Amino acid sequence: MKYPRIGFHQQGVLLLLIALFLLTGSTALFLVVMNSNNVDQARLDRTLDALNEASDALIAYSMMYGDLYGNNGAGPGHLPCPDTDGDELEDTPCGPGAFGRIPREIVLPTADIYAVSDFNSGTDQRIWYALSNNFRADPPAVANPQIPGTLTVDGSGGYAAVLIAPGAVLAGQNRPSNLAADYLEGTNNGGAVFQSVDAGIFNDVVRGITVDELMSPVTARVAEKIGEVLQSFFDRRGNYPRTRLQFENALTGGGGGGGGGGGRGGGRGGGRGGGGGGGGGGGPGLTMPAWFTDNDWLANTVYNRLNTNTATVAFAGCNIVYTLNAGVTSIAKTSSQC
């Protein structure tokens, strides 16, 4: 008995249908995988954005610390304590190795609210926060660009703070919880050493803040405060301090403040308050806040007078040079990063 042969045309149609079926299946699989990858990438992007926003808020808080807490506060360069009890507020004071969740907000002495991060606020997936011993605001430590960070990320030291966003729950973790080990894996759940990449062990996303990153805007704020004091000196004396000693006295109020300017003013009948003679130079001028000397900024400030109304200041541990000009509120700088 002869069986009917399938013609070449029919064979081609059959093969085309099989290929189409396989292609459709593989395309569907590819779309599922691609969609999953897109979802994962979108989630990672949101997490990275949240970490960067929280980092920016902490750095801005550190830069403006002297303005937020007054002249006798810890001063610029300090960071808030973590939230250790889960109420979304910082818990002070914090001891060495401070570690907890990042505060959602900070209540200032004025009762105003400083927002830090509302990422996953009200849930157990908030960002975790490690704070270097040397940059705590309460109790205050001496903070300036020469002070090293005590935290390490991926084998590199010098971090002032580390932010960690937890991933999905893994085997052995129990949530909700107030224990770091239920959210963070390996060395990331406490201590001073952190890892940012090791998919085989954990799914945390890590963002460190280096001392240089923290101190770049902080030094700019300190330079602005120095500029205000030197402007006050210039208004009374008609020039910037000529020597290092004059510079230090101008900033701290030592040496009678203005020096010889008082005598000149007195000769004109005390028109500018100069009747007080050489001791006051027309009366006391502005001086730097207490935090300036408390944090050793004076000892680490390099002053260079260029001419009567122009000078530069720089700070040990930071390679930015700031140029101050009398009567000019803006300050030129050689770089944006230490």
PLM-predicted stretches and their roles:
Residues K2-N35:
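N-terminal single-pass transmembrane signal-anchor helix
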Residues M1-K2, D40:
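Elongated, non-catalytic scaffold/linker segments and compositionally distinctive motifs
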